[in-house]
């Protein structure tokens, strides 16, 4: 038994680290770049970089080659409801992070992107979204759903926000706002920071509702957006 250190914020020698979107192998004591994780679309954010570093370290310990490991990481399709890239419609990308049922989980989504349109809300946990206040500057606009809407509106204060109530209204409002900024790329991210039980049986049902609403928008806008629309596919 032996321990391989990993890190997402500093070089560890010997060890494996993912810093600034680059995966480094420092198992020999010298850090060698092995993969550009920024090109792995299913692995946004530093937390996914850390996951990739852990997977790489485990596979190297089992004797797999660097080439095989990196190929598997770069081709990884991601997990449903966990910062899942759902679709791109015109200039707007949609991400489903319905598994984020508390502020700590949504923190990873806010860290992963520079700017986003945030669909948030549901059955709030005790600390609500207070732990996310340092990252409110990343929010272009918040679209509030579920029982926590009024409470979160007060938390957001001067951050642009809209109480939408349900998923359909939130997805539609976020898309219309984002589409108006064409051709600049916009991100719409469902990362509720809440339990789902006020409106859904579980977080999977909530995420599936988001996916279905995005599919509906894709169908409705295909003719208007023409070549700018990427057809919807469920990942």
Language-model-derived ranges and their functions:
Residues 2-7, 118, 141-147:
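Short, hydrophobic beta-strand segments that form beta-sheet elements in well-ordered domains
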Residues 36-139:
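Nucleotide phosphate-binding/pyrophosphate-handling subdomain across enzymes
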Residues 83, 118, 142, 152, ...:
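Hydrophobic, well-ordered secondary-structure elements that form the walls
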Residues 193-219:
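Glycine/aspartate-rich loop-and-adjacent alpha/beta segment that forms the canonical ThDP
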Residues 9, 122-125, 148, 189, ...:
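Short glycine-rich anion-binding loops that position phosphate/pyrophosphate groups of nucleotides
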């Amino acid at each position: 038994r032996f321990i391989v250190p990993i890190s997402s914020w500093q070089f560890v020698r010997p060890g494996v680290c993912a810093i600034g979107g680059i995966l480094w192998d420092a198992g020999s004591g010298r850090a060698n770049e092995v993969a550009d994780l920024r090109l792995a679309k299913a692995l946004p954010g530093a937390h996914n970089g850390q996951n990739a570093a852990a997977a790489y370290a485990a596979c190297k310990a089992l004797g797999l080659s660097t080439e095989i490991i990196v190929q598997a990481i770069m081709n990884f399709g991601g997990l449903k409801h966990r910062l899942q890239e759902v679709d791109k419609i015109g200039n707007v990308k949609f991400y489903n992070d319905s598994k984020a049922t508390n502020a700590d989980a949504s923190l990873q989504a806010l860290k992963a992107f520079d700017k986003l349109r945030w669909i948030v809300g549901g059955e709030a946990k005790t600390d609500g979204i207070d732990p996310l206040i340092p990252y409110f500057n990343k929010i272009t606009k918040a679209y509030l759903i579920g029982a926590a809407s009024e409470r979160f509106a007060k938390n957001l204060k001067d951050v642009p926000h809209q109480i939408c109530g349900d998923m359909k209204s939130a997805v539609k409002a976020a898309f219309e706002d984002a589409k108006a900024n064409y051709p600049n790329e916009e991100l719409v991210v469902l990362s509720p920071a809440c339990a789902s039980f006020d409106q859904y049986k579980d977080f999977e049902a909530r995420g599936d509702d988001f996916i279905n609403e995005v599919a509906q928008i894709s169908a409705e806008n295909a003719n208007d957006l023409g070549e700018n629309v990427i057809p919807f596919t469920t990942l």
